[in-house]
Amino acid sequence: MLLHIIARGKIARSPEEELVTRYEKRLTWPVKLTELPETGGRIPDPQTPFKTVLLDERGKDLSSHRLARQLERWRDDGMRETRFVLGAADGHAQEERAEADLLLAFGSATWPHLLARAMLMEQLYRATSILAGHPYHRAG
């Protein structure tokens, strides 16, 4: 299953970009990064069937294990792509939230956009490592 991160704005050269690249290289699942302008821009057509996850401060705060199990269910149900969409500074429109399969939050705090992107990539690596039985995640 393709893990497709769709984000507004360019990450450019930054410490966050280094983290994103580090975890992208470690991932064994296929991953694609799409950067869109802050406004406008067209989200590419998905591989179908697919699921959409919006990163949103009103979303569910899933543990790494719960995220792993959700990805596993979608993969086993035949999803070809899961899209993780990070909105612009003002977040997502109500229509986008209503159409999403999952709203995901990294706790109740608000995170800088670039840091949220790096955190997402790390969590995807962690979740896929859990599913593979890799010792990266140390539950305690």
From Swiss-Prot:
<keyword id="KW-0808">Transferase</keyword>
<keyword id="KW-0698">rRNA processing</keyword>
<dbReference type="GO" id="GO:0070038">
    <property type="term" value="F:rRNA (pseudouridine-N3-)-methyltransferase activity"/>
</dbReference>
<comment type="function">
    <text>Specifically methylates the pseudouridine at position 1915 (m3Psi1915) in 23S rRNA.</text>
</comment>
<feature type="binding site">
    <location>
        <position position="55"/>
    </location>
    <ligand>
        <name>S-adenosyl-L-methionine</name>
    </ligand>
</feature>
<dbReference type="Pfam" id="PF02590">
    <property type="entry name" value="SPOUT_MTase"/>
</dbReference>
<keyword id="KW-0963">Cytoplasm</keyword>
<dbReference type="InterPro" id="IPR029026">
    <property type="entry name" value="tRNA_m1G_MTases_N"/>
</dbReference>
<protein>
    <recommendedName>
        <fullName>Ribosomal RNA large subunit methyltransferase H</fullName>
        <ecNumber>2.1.1.177</ecNumber>
    </recommendedName>
</protein>
<keyword id="KW-0489">Methyltransferase</keyword>
<comment type="subunit">
    <text>Homodimer.</text>
</comment>
<dbReference type="InterPro" id="IPR029028">
    <property type="entry name" value="Alpha/beta_knot_MTases"/>
</dbReference>
<comment type="similarity">
    <text>Belongs to the RNA methyltransferase RlmH family.</text>
</comment>
<dbReference type="InterPro" id="IPR003742">
    <property type="entry name" value="RlmH-like"/>
</dbReference>
<keyword id="KW-0949">S-adenosyl-L-methionine</keyword>
<feature type="binding site">
    <location>
        <position position="87"/>
    </location>
    <ligand>
        <name>S-adenosyl-L-methionine</name>
    </ligand>
</feature>
<dbReference type="GO" id="GO:0005737">
    <property type="term" value="C:cytoplasm"/>
</dbReference>
